From Swiss-Prot:
Biased composition (Low complexity): 464-476
UniProt protein name: NUAK family SNF1-like kinase 2
Organism field: Rattus norvegicus (Rat)
Active site as annotated: 179 (proton acceptor)
EC number: 2.7.11.1
Length: 630
């Protein structure tokens, strides 16, 4: 079988910003409340003293360049290596990019997880924002996989488990990443996963829908490619399924050569079936369900048997064990049964033997309820811009007093809560919610249609994971639905207020190189520091071309204000010890060594979900081992 190379694709350009209401509130007010908060919910503060960063860091090579600046490797006086991202404020051209940058800094500075890139410090002056981040020395996961014909299952599980742990932590705190891909997953010096690039991340709420069509084409979910609203976590689950397929099989699940074929395959869930099935096939099938309601959640993945095979605890139980809890033998057997019941969910559609087995051996396996239907493609419904949309009213800000988008004034300090708009036409009174009928006799409001082509069309060069993701796109100006929280049924929405079209621009990258064409012939606006809320926007200095950045301009000899980041909780250690997998290997003959994946036969799989008898045998063997351990 000819191996299909991994394709590098750029990101879908996010749609026009309708997020001014939702994103203007501090991150602390919008985080999901929990009895044991995993993050400190504090605002970003300012130090009232200046810093000359050239005296604090020794700058080494440049890691990458982007639309807004560059990322450099640097060494502190203590010897610690860091990655420093510089953002030039005169490159920020619209409200949408402003919200992405501000949200990325707020979210990443609040997250504290061993597998997420940490922000150490943030500095700002009148012309630049400088972000000091954790440095991942071994590059990204794309290069790591490309250098190897195929990862063995143990290594694939090791990487995937760390990705799931970080993403599960984000979802527990109400954060959706929305741009998971190999290029945004870095490796540190110890070979551990570090997820980067939260430029497209956002907060999500149950019962409300997001509508930004963003992400990378080969990792985009059916909701994204078809322009349907989504809650958020289901988009990450789909991308996680694509990542698992790549880790296990070494190829992309969908054909990225042709746009029409790619959209059709994603919409129907018709991924390429490997010639050599893996034990993870059931989990891949569950994650790549077209119906988002039936798609595996991060809770399902964290408790799946394949993810936890060879580990003493499930991902969701690590925090409890760290605090002193100890699972009993009965709970271990129940966990094993739960893993198999969850992992076999997609298999129950066609496996009568498995259904009968669970009815006999697993309590509740034959519970009543709606039967599992055969997976099918979602019909191509009316595009989201054919529907009438509504903005969710924010109690902290009245949408009836929101001016038009073109009249918004950009704030001087982009990390500070924005002041209310001071000018623009105001639409008097909220519009009444009106359901939209899909009957042929009733006309649908005339709203610009989503393009039939172009969403996933053009390929982009690959980017560094330190960069934020959205890029310009030929079809970007046609994607008008921004990140809007829509409550209730997405079919019952009202039309948003018509506004001028914003330019779609990347956050820190355009084809991996610094762009000069976007600002030619224009006078870019600049932004002041955080202590200035409103003042006339000065024009850029005429002595420096708008598209040029000198080698020393990242810090030069300027003074910066340091921003006080939220305090972080101690990191949660990941545990590992002798497990069921280790005990099983004691009874097996020594392995003859790893073979090429195309040389292995189907019978080499020790626990394939395609064989019901193997499932039964492995389950009984695992129960026997658990009873001996208890």
């Amino acid at each position: 079988m000819e191996s299909v190379a991994l394709h590098r694709r750029g990101n879908l350009a996010p749609s026009a910003s309708a997020l001014a209401t939702e994103s203007a509130r501090p991150l602390a007010d919008r985080l999901i409340k929990s009895p044991k908060p995993l993050m400190k919910k504090q605002a970003v503060k300012r130090h009232h003293h200046k810093h000359n960063l050239r005296h604090r860091y020794e700058f080494l090579e440049t890691l990458g360049k982007g639309t807004y600046g560059k990322v450099k490797k640097a060494r502190e006086s203590s010897g610690r290596l860091v990655a420093i991202k510089s953002i030039r404020k005169d490159k920020i051209k619209d409200e949408q990019d402003l919200l992405h940058i501000r949200r990325e800094i707020e979210i990443m500075s609040s997250l504290n997880h061993p597998h997420i890139i940490a922000i150490h410090e943030v500095f700002e002056n009148s012309s630049k924002i400088v972000i000091v981040m954790e440095y991942a020395s071994r590059g990204d996961l794309y290069d790591y996989i490309s250098e190897r014909p195929r990862l063995n299952e143990r290594d694939a599980r090791h990487f995937f488990r760390q990705i799931v742990s970080a993403l599960h932590y984000c979802h527990q705190n109400g954060i959706v990443h929305r741009d998971l891909k190999l290029e945004n997953i870095l490796l540190d010096a110890s070979g551990n996963i570090k997820i980067a690039d939260f430029g497209l991340s956002n907060l999500y709420h149950k019962g409300k829908f997001l509508q930004t069509f963003c992400g990378s084409p080969l990792y985009a979910s059916p909701e994204i490619v078809n322009g349907k609203p989504y809650v958020g976590p289901e988009v990450d689950s789909w991308s996680l399924g694509v990542l698992l397929y790549i880790l296990v099989h070494g190829t992309m699940p969908f054909d990225g050569q042709d746009h029409k074929t790619l959209v059709k395959q994603i919409s129907s869930g018709a991924y390429r079936e490997p010639c050599k099935p893996s034990d993870a096939c059931g989990l891949i099938r569950w994650l790549l369900m077209v119906n988002p309601i039936r798609r595996a959640t991060l809770e399902d993945v964290a408790s799946h048997w394949w993810v936890n095979w060879g580990y003493s605890t499930r991902i969701g139980e690590q925090e409890a064990l760290r605090e002193g809890g100890h699972p009993s033998g009965d709970s271990g057997r129940a966990s094993m049964a739960d893993w198999l019941r969850r992992s076999s969910r997609p298999l129950l559609e066609n496996g009568a033997k498995v259904c009968s087995f669970f009815k006999q051996h697993v309590p509740g396996g034959g519970s009543t309820g709606p039967g599992l239907e055969r997976q099918h493609s979602l019909k191509k419904s009316r595009k989201e811009n054919d529907m009438a949309q509504t903005l969710q009213n924010d109690p902290a800000e009245d949408t009836s007093s929101r001016p038009g988008k073109n009249s918004l004034k950009l704030p001087k300090g982009i990390l500070k809560k924005k002041a209310s708009p001071s000018s623009g036409e105001v639409q008097e009174g909220p519009q009444e919610l009106r359901p939209v009928s899909n009957t042929p006799g009733q006309p649908v409001p005339a709203i610009p249609l989503l393009p039939r082509k172009g969403i996933l069309k053009k390929s982009r060069q690959r980017e560094s994971g330190y960069y934020s993701s959205p890029e310009p796109s030929e079809s970007g100006e046609l994607l008008d639905a921004g990140d809007v929280f829509v409550s209730g049924d997405p079919m019952e929405q009202k039309s948003p207020q018509a506004s001028g079209r914003l330019h779609r621009k990347g956050i820190l990258k355009l084809n991996g190189k610094f762009s000069r064409t976007a600002l030619e012939g224009t006078a870019p606006s600049t932004f002041g520091s955080l202590d200035q809320l409103a003042s006339p926007h000065p024009t850029a200095r005429a002595s420096r071309p708008s598209g040029a950045v000198s080698e020393d301009s990242i810090l030069s000899s300027e003074s910066f204000d340091q921003l006080d980041l939220p305090e972080r909780l101690p990191e949660t250690p990941l545990r590992g010890c002798v497990s069921v997998d280790n005990l099983r290997r004691l009874e097996q003959p020594p392995s003859e060594g790893l073979k090429r994946w195309w040389q292995e036969s189907l019978g080499d799989s020790c626990f394939s979900l395609t064989d019901c008898q193997e499932v039964t045998a492995a389950y009984r063997q695992a129960l026997g081992i658990c009873s001996k351990l208890s």
